[in-house]
Amino acid sequence: EIRDAMLAVSGNLDRARPKGSAAMNMKVTELTNNGAEAKRILQVADTSTHRSVYLPLVRTLVPRSLEVFDFAEQGMVTGNRDTTTVPTQALYLLNDPFVQKQAQALAKRVLAPAALDDAARIHLAYRLLLARTATAKECERAQHYLGEYEAAAEKESNPRLAAWASFCQAILASAEFRYIK
């Protein structure tokens, strides 16, 4: 699950079972008309750091992080899920606040060890995200990207963090992160 992988590498994954259910006290009428309570459940699901298996699911309400990546239709028996690669998935990975938040948390995690230089941080990011070290060419390109981004992000309150968050988000959006070899 891509959502769980993003939470895990960012250090935000809450492995504990959540207490209660956001859907437990929901009025039946809310289920049919997607009212305020239904929207609240979607908001809870979109901001939760628990594993996806614990997300509150109501038949007609699927959290955005699951819907965009071929979540199985809840009203039907599904033995095999479709696997697609569509533009909405890339747009989600590049623009969704949830993904941006995980990228920023991951950037903070990569920047935390004070003893590391940027090349070592790039290798750390690659190990966390892709379970391998960066090649020499990837490391060189990443250092160039980070330098350019940091120089251009002078309006940001923390240009270094912004550059690393952007770098981490780019890897989160990569095909290599999304697909297991």
Predicted segment positions?
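Amphipathic alpha-helical segments that form the core helices of the histone-fold
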Residues: E140-A151
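Short coil/turn helix-boundary motifs
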Residues: A114, Y149, A153-E156
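An acidic, gly/pro-interrupted, aromatic-rich
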Residues: E1-T133, S166, I171-K181
